[in-house]
Regions:
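Glycine-rich flavin
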Residues: 1-100
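DPxDG-like acidic metal-binding loop motif
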Residues: 90-125, 129-130
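Glycine-rich beta->alpha junctions and the first turn(s) of the following alpha-helix
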Residues: 135, 143-239
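Extended, amphipathic, non-transmembrane alpha-helical segments
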Residues: 208-210, 245-248, 284
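C-terminal helix-coil-helix/basic helical segment that borders enzyme active sites and/or dimer interfaces
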Residues: 240-277, 290-298
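Short segments within alpha-helical structural elements
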Residues: 284-291, 322-326
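Glycine-rich phosphate/cofactor-binding loops in nucleotide/flavin-utilizing enzymes
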Residues: 295-343
Length: 343
């Protein structure tokens, strides 16, 4: 969980590509476990961008404390008051929230339209038990709600301060390169390891099962069938291609940060495009595997059906939705204004 946390508080502060490598390995076994781990790990990295006072309040007693998030802006309303903001709203998809002592929430500041994020303690928000879903059931990604909660200024962070470089208020305390990586441009890297790992795990299950399976009609070994061999190749190529694309983006983000530079807009939308494209490659692999598994994959006691559900649930995340990310990339590539204000 402390993979990206600053070393000064006992974290590992690993290179950015570690998010892909570790989360995908966890997801080979369980997509929900990997999803929550990735969220909790990334929130320690994100907190390093906040003012030092906020970091000390959250990490002070327990640097391994768990932090959830619900960083969607339209559901939240923030009103500027003396010393901070009054925050209200109801946010969906706060993954792993039941185990957490804090939550990060997004809101639009009334009057200015500014996008801002807020760190809120457990006693100031309500968890709503409504995560009854098809896939990633184990994440407990429930709604959270605040009603006119005061949030001190130092527990808030403007989105404009997170667009790359040492422009955020935590830069002096956390000067490492990974804390100069732009938050929302790198969003795909935070979670895309999960569909990658799910697809890899499903591929391994599929491959192992083929060794002993015989056709119930012809009696032939499935492994001897040319069509099955081609499906194995297609699935593995899709997974390998996704991994290469994702690791390339992560390594590029790390290298730019190590040069103490911020990526330009075209680079940012390319990372978002590549993340969504990699997600589609993982989905392609999963669909090939599941269809090729036949009716065996329908049973509840077969892990392939959980892999199928979990991967499709993961790919419903906005950062992995191809149409949304491709549109943003296409606009910027064609010289039109970017439609994503967080970049």
């Amino acid at each position: 969980m402390r993979l990206l946390q600053p070393r000064r508080v006992g974290g590992s502060e690993c290179d950015w590509v570690a998010m892909i490598d570790v989360s995908s390995e966890l997801a080979r076994g369980c997509g929900s476990t990997a999803w929550n781990w990735a969220n909790w790990a990334v929130h320690h990295w994100m907190l390093a961008l906040w003012p030092r006072q906020c970091q000390d309040e959250v990490w002070g007693d327990d640097p391994s404390v768990l932090i959830a998030s619900a960083i969607l802006f339209p559901p939240g309303k923030a009103v500027r008051v003396d010393g901070g903001y009054r925050l209200s709203g109801r946010w969906p998809f706060s993954s792993g929230v039941d185990a957490c002592a804090w939550d990060m929430m997004g809101a639009v500041v009334e009057g200015t339209g500014e996008l801002r994020m807020f760190v809120v303690p457990r006693e100031d928000y309500r968890v709503i038990d409504n995560w009854h879903v098809l896939g990633l059931r184990g994440t407990g990604s429930k709604d959270v709600e605040c009603k006119d909660v005061f949030v001190a200024e130092h527990r808030t962070l403007a989105v404009d301060a997170t667009k790359g470089g040492a422009t955020h208020p935590g830069a002096a305390s956390n000067p490492g390169p990974i804390f100069r990586i732009p938050l929302f441009a790198a969003l795909p890297h935070m979670l895309i390891g999960i569909p990658l790992g799910i697809a890899q795990g499903a591929y391994e299950i599929f491959l192992e099962g083929l060794q002993a399976r015989m056709s119930r009609y012809s009696g032939r070994s499935l492994a001897d069938m040319t069509a099955v061999q081609m499906k194995v190749a297609e699935a593995s190529a899709s997974i390998d291609a996704a991994r290469l694309v994702l690791r390339r983006s992560c390594i590029a983000a790390q290298e730019i940060a190590e040069r103490n530079e911020a990526p330009d807009l075209m680079t940012k939308v390319t990372w978002r495009r590549d993340g969504a494209f990699a997600a589609q490659l993982c989905e392609r692999a999963m669909d090939v595997i599941y269809k090729s598994a036949g009716a065996t994959g329908l049973y509840d006691d077969q892990p392939l059906q959980r892999c199928y559900r979990d991967l499709h649930a993961a790919n419903a995340h906005i950062s992995m939705m191809w149409d949304a990310q491709a549109t943003t990339y296409g606009r910027v590539a064609l010289g039109l204004p970017c439609d994503n204000p967080t970049l």
